[in-house]
């Protein structure tokens, strides 16, 4: 068909205010038919929360394990849809009035993909990931209740440095977020 696409449906559940779990599935048409290529399991535990009126500071630790049965076709490590492996890291978020700033750092390790797609020996199989996100509440200008839809504008810097060869990647991701 000339088009290649990946779909990653996921389900997330906030068990309580400190613990969240998420599972994702990886589906693509990379072999000219729609197939499930793998899945991911994620958990995040908030261990610090300092809340005040119109501001908060929070920190959490997280981990993800993914398995994938697709061919390995890129040097960048990405266990959300491309590689089998794990990731573990921490995230910190500061909210001041309508501005949110979030930063994270994590370690990511890739494994061989099943059934027999070996991770290339010449490539780095582990990396450090880092993000910086800035988001601003655009709507509502003033809350009348907490059931109102939020509209946020955001920009995120998503980076990765491969530990064995020093190569780095940086994506800049602008977005609009709707919280319904």
For the regions a language model picked out, list residue spans one by one.
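Extended low-complexity, intrinsically disordered segments associated with secretion/export
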Residues: 116-117
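Transmembrane beta-barrel domains of Gram-negative outer membranes and organellar outer membranes
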Residues: 1-103, 107-112, 121-180
């Amino acid at each position: 068909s000339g088009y290649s696409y990946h779909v990653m449906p996921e389900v997330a559940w906030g068990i309580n205010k400190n613990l969240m779990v998420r599972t994702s599935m990886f589906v693509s048409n990379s072999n000219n038919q729609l197939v499930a290529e793998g899945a991911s399991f994620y958990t995040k535990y908030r261990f610090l929360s300092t809340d005040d009126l119109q501001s908060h500071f929070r920190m959490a630790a997280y981990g993800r394990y993914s398995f994938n049965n697709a061919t390995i076709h890129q040097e960048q490590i990405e266990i959300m849809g491309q590689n089998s492996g794990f990731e573990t890291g921490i995230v910190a978020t500061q909210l001041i009035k309508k501005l949110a700033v979030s930063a994270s750092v994590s370690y990511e390790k890739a494994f061989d993909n099943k059934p027999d797609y070996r991770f290339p020996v010449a490539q780095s199989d582990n990396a450090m990931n880092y993000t910086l996100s800035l988001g601003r509440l655009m709507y509502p200008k003033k809350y009348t209740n907490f059931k109102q839809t939020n509209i946020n504008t955001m920009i995120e810097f998503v980076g990765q440095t491969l530990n064995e060869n020093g190569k780095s990647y940086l994506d800049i991701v602008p977005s609009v977020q709707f919280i319904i």
